[in-house]
Amino acid sequence: MSDKVLTIPNLLSFLRMALIPVFASLLFYGKYEWALFVFFFAGVSDGIDGFIARRFNQSSSLGTIIDPIADKLLMTTSFIILALPHVLPESNKHFPVPFWVSAAVIGRDVLIIAVALAIFIMTGFRGFQPSIWGKISTVVQILAIGIILIASIIPDYSGWYLPTVYTLVTAMAVFSGVHYIFHVAKLMNEEKSDPENEGN
């Protein structure tokens, strides 16, 4: 893993962060089609930067930090804004996004950061890795935001499926957050049992 800063994956991560205020502004001004386009572009860029990093050996120490930060900022910003009144069309009875959905998404991230920070301070452990359920939860959140934006574009659409989407996002956020605690415990046990770490 290199210490380079100006790699294509890192530039894409920086671009994703730069698009967050653009996305937020489009939502506030009711430009839902453009907001969906920007969000879609940001989501695609997330997949592309990961592919480039692996395929062309451009993984970097900085990238392991800014890539998840960019993702968390985009998700957190999205769910906060979508839960605010008068942002999404008021004609849809399922808008705005319920507060408890946004609270679950943000609470999960706060829990993970708090657990990781506490473990690092107490043990010096650095081998944190995302869990499969965390990745699935992120995918669910991305799809959910896309579905919500599509529902906001179609006029007078009931969006009967939105409560199910909200429930799924919340359930995945809670489950993946709790699962991450056990995931980190497993990683720590594996590091302790690694012969290369004996005596360190």
PLM features: residue spans?
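Alpha-helical transmembrane bundles and membrane-interface segments of multipass inner-membrane proteins
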Residues: M1-N200
